[in-house]
A protein has these predicted regions:
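Cys-dependent protein tyrosine phosphatase-like superfamily
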Residues: 1-129, 141-178
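Ser/Thr-glycine-rich phosphate-binding loops at phosphate-binding pockets of nucleotides
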Residues: 134, 138-139
């Protein structure tokens, strides 16, 4: 009820004919509107770790409802575009793919991605839920990386990313958020 873009990364066929496992990764949008029933469902689903990729401005406006729950480890690892690149984007001098590349390739971006994967590697129990504000850009990047590492074909990765556009097409407030 309280999210519009929460889904499991399980069930994708890999290049070697196997499938990604369910209950390992959930991608999501902001969790600040979760109902008590939503929280119970997520706990039953096996959520043990939450990775919040929103920046300080976003987290200060709306705290992650899962961040203070017993039995759930919460990490805030912001993925943010560098100011120069964001200015170029807003002035039409680059496109969104340039922003994504800068978030992963700049020195700070590389460190952030490394930190994300260190957390993922260290959390061996339960499901990991990761999110940003809309579950679109930053969440899409991490989903793409995880599915790619699992050997999911590119078309399915693109299809997974594109689902958000069907979910938000009527919501004019949803946009790139950072």
């Amino acid at each position: 009820e309280g999210t519009s873009n929460t889904r499991d990364l399980g069930g994708y066929v890999t290049k070697n004919g196997e499938s990604t496992k369910f209950h390992i990764f959930l991608r999501s949008d902001n969790t600040n509107n979760l109902t008590n029933e939503d929280i119970l469902v997520l706990k039953k689903y096996g959520i043990k770790t939450v990775i919040d990729m929103r920046g300080y401005k976003e987290t200060s406006k709306s705290e992650d409802k899962l961040s203070k729950l017993d039995g759930i480890k919460y990490y805030n690892i912001p993925i943010e575009a560098d100011n120069k690149k964001m200015s170029e984007f807003l002035n039409g001098k680059c496109d969104l793919s340039d922003i994504y590349l800068s978030m992963m390739s700049e020195s700070q971006g590389k460190t952030t991605i490394k930190n994300l994967f260190e957390i993922i590697a260290s959390e061996s129990e339960g499901t990991i839920l990761f999110h940003c504000t809309y579950g679109k850009d930053r969440t899409g990047i991490l989903s793409m990386l995880l599915l790619g590492l699992c050997g999911v074909n590119e078309e399915d990765i693109i299809r997974d990313y594109s689902i958000i556009y069907d979910l938000i097409k009527d919501n004019k407030q949803v946009q790139t958020c950072y």
